[in-house]
């Protein structure tokens, strides 16, 4: 009987547990903000410190992931996240504690993708592994969010202890992932100038340029849409229960998971440019929310947004890793992708928060989110036909 999972399955399991806890924490932080009477703007602030960790540390984490063995890097990331939870248990400021969790997450991220070319040989195997990793991550995001909301209602301390136990299990599973050699020659000096140089290299390559703009605009639209739906559901559908809203938001994630699973049957890595049409569909579905007034229709469109989004993003991720692996190294590529995606999200969520403060109507923000995504997709379509 084979009790020890295959290296890829060990990675998927470790990633599932890790992402599950990452998403529990945001809802627990929400509970802590309510319990300790922090002001209302604190949740976006907590989210921002997390995104900021990604933006600030990007130049160094890719090097760290490529220099060391990736399976060790995954452990370091989870140990730092555990420290962040201990800070929350010790009643430290939630924005600071969540920022520490963000540091762990940003270290973890390049390694989980960067180890894939080492474990999955060949383009098609890499696309399949990507598709599965993305699907497991999304299921973890959905179930983790709901578990976080549910547990933090019962007991915040208990839910934090559950997080620590799960991280320890994930660290244990990491020991089953084989060690890749790593590249000891990588230096941390000149990290910023070389990071900028690597970014220029990726943006000069047509494939990776397309993928970076594509994934960045997808995550920006998703992050803003999530914030808007929080306000849109009570306003338009008259539903105010937090648990219900989290379930409605979860529908998009289910759509993304479906999209990620069916992608390999629709698009190959070489046809990555066809993904732009699915981005177009996603943008149109977001704009449709200006006319939606009933729950069943909203659910159908959220499912569609997710599904189109999943097909939009998975081939671009695989394409970017393929180019990166051949040019600047897998870990550095993911670090630049993280930097681009989180900068896009930071700008999107920041603009939305500002608009909200200035009293701009939620429908105007919704229209803006759809139009901005469509503008980026139009740019991708122009890019495709410009150099044929």
Language model: regions and residue ranges:
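Helix-loop junctions on the cytosolic side of multi-pass membrane transporters
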Residues: 114, 118-119, 160-189, 381-388
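Short amphipathic helix-loop junctions that connect adjacent transmembrane helices
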Residues: 26-41, 227-243
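Juxtamembrane helix-start elements in MFS-like secondary transporters
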Residues: 39-47, 240-249, 330, 334
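C-terminal transmembrane helical hairpin of 12-TM major facilitator-type secondary transporters
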Residues: 273-313
